[in-house]
Amino acid sequence: MKLENAELKHIERIVAISKAAFDSDIHVGASEAAAPPDYDSTAWHIQMKNEGHLLQAVIDGEIVGGAILFVDKDGETLYVGRIFIDPVHHRKGDGLSLMKMVETFYPGIRKIKLDTPLWNARTNAFYTKLGYCEVKRDKEFAYYQKELD
């Protein structure tokens, strides 16, 4: 898998994967209204691409997922806005590969932060498996953090 800055010519594919991935959450406890804001919006994904936050995950020339990432002003903290993998690639290790690439994409990152809905047992287990520690929770989300070496 390669992780690279998203290309405008691939936006429609990236949006389709985002929609399919978040729509598949209905199978792990989501209500129909549980997807993140703008997960199916082409305009929003173009904005994220233009601001340098949208990445595409590629395997053998095929886009299989994406990530929305934000680097703090300190240059040492990365916030994972969201990651998504085509449901066809679920349970094949591709999400794990994507997160490992996210963790090394920006040089100098020492801490990664993210959040995920409490109802989503799949993502909560996934981030714990990757070594993320829950640092806080509220009524809707669990907040995770990982210190990098």
Predicted regions and their residues:
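Conserved GNAT-fold acetyl-CoA-binding loop/helix
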Residues: 19-44
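Conserved acetyl-CoA pyrophosphate-binding loop and the N-cap/start of the following alpha-helix
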Residues: 89, 93-101
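A short helix-loop-beta-strand connector motif used in the catalytic cores of GNAT acetyltransferases and
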Residues: 42-56
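Conserved GNAT acetyl-CoA-binding A-motif
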Residues: 99, 105-118
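Conserved beta-strand-loop-alpha-helix junction that forms the acyl-donor binding cleft
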Residues: 90, 113-124, 140-142
